[in-house]
């Protein structure tokens, strides 16, 4: 890659941390609002047996919208917003790990791969209990029980804000499984998200390098970065979706064994069962990845320490 194609990377020591975290929370919230409906749809598709209720992403979207309205697409959203904490822990761990690995390797791919995997380990330790509660709320549907637990009372008009539902689910999890219930599927989550995060970065650099060779010299870096991100996300989603299906079933259905869940899924639905919810996952990942690739670098530019803003070309 030619020198003028090289992108100056803003590292941890270049940032005004206060601005970085304030802008970061706002950016993350915007992403969550835009992709949450597809996260909910993906969860329901992965848990349902065969095509007993929904026949695909679009069918699920239409049926949920008809049955529960827009609020139904955001069921469990309030609880899910607590993962903003894990999101900030992710970026902090990612940046600090990059800084640490830089003492041993100057390869951007190596730094990103190790940092991505480490960041996912930290983030998932915080996210899994929130995910468990959020997923059970996602599975609530008027008049039907789709998961292990069902909230009591009328779901009519209750979507985004439903404190009573959340407390009800938490109590049922505690009663059935104790505190361990909030970490059900933890290993499966690690086996899903650590590889996903670690794999994304090498593919991102690969696609960016290939596109930089194809694009005209005057093409801005941001263009092939914005294209490379979703391509890398789609690739990582395809590779890790089987584990994501198993993770979701372990957490929602209360299964205790990854191996037994895998065997049951294969027996009931065959290999295609491992690809359930893939299109919804890619759809939800695409906008967030574009924002992460384009927005995250813009976020870091906005968060530069004042004395560094004009000191070099970022």
UniProtKB/Swiss-Prot annotation:
Primary subcellular site in the record, as a coarse category: mitochondrion
Signal sequence, start to end: none
Native source organism of the sequence: Mus musculus (Mouse)
Catalytic activity: L-valine(in) = L-valine(out); L-leucine(in) = L-leucine(out)
Protein's UniProt keywords contain Transport: yes
One Gene Ontology CC term in the entry: mitochondrial inner membrane
Membrane topology: Multi-pass membrane protein
Pfam families xref list: Mito_carr (PF00153)
Subcellular location: Mitochondrion membrane
Record-linked InterPro entries: Mit_carrier (IPR002067), Mitochondrial_sb/sol_carrier (IPR018108), Mt_carrier_dom_sf (IPR023395), SLC25A44 (IPR042164)
Keyword Transmembrane: yes
Official protein name in the record: Solute carrier family 25 member 44
Induction notes from the record: Induction by cold exposure in brown adipose tissues.
Solcar repeats: 18-100, 107-210, 220-302
Distribution of this protein across tissues and organs: Highly expressed in brown adipose tissues compared with other metabolic organs.
GO molecular function, one term: branched-chain amino acid transmembrane transporter activity
GO BP field: amino acid transport; branched-chain amino acid catabolic process; branched-chain amino acid transport; regulation of cold-induced thermogenesis
Residue ranges crossing the lipid bilayer per the database entry: 20-42, 71-90, 113-133, 185-201, 222-239, 278-296
Family note: Belongs to the mitochondrial carrier (TC 2.A.29) family.
């Amino acid at each position: 890659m030619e020198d003028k194609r090289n992108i100056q990377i803003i590292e941890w020591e270049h940032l005004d941390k206060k601005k970085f975290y304030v802008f970061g929370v706002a950016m993350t919230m915007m992403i969550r609002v835009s992709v949450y409906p597809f996260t909910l749809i993906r969860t329901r598709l992965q848990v349902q047996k065969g095509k007993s209720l929904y026949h695909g992403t679009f069918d699920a979207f239409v049926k949920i919208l008809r049955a529960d309205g827009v609020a139904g697409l955001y069921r469990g959203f309030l609880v899910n917003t607590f993962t903003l904490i894990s999101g900030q822990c992710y970026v902090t761990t990612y940046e600090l790990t990059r800084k640490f690995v830089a003492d041993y390797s100057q390869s951007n791919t190596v730094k990103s791969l190790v940092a991505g995997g480490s960041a996912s380990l930290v983030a998932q330790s915080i996210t899994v209990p929130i995910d468990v509660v959020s997923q059970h709320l996602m599975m609530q549907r008027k008049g039907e029980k789709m998961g292990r637990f069902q909230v009591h009372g009328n779901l009519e008009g209750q979507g985004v804000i439903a404190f009573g539902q959340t407390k009800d689910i938490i109590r049922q999890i505690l009663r059935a499984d104790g505190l361990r219930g909030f970490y059900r599927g933890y290993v499966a989550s690690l086996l899903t998200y650590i590889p996903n995060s670690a794999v994304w970065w090498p593919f991102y650099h690969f696609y960016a390098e290939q596109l930089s060779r194809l694009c005209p010299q005057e093409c801005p870096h941001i263009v092939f970065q914005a294209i490379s991100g979703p391509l890398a996300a789609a690739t990582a989603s395809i590779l890790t979706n089987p584990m994501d299906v198993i993770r979701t079933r372990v957490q929602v259905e209360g299964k205790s064994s990854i191996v037994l869940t895998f065997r049951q899924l294969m027996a009931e639905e065959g290999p295609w069962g491992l690809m359930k919810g893939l299109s919804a996952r890619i759809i939800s990942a695409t906008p967030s990845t574009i924002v992460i690739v384009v927005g995250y670098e813009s976020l870091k530019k906005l968060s530069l320490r004042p004395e560094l803003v004009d000191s070099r070309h970022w």
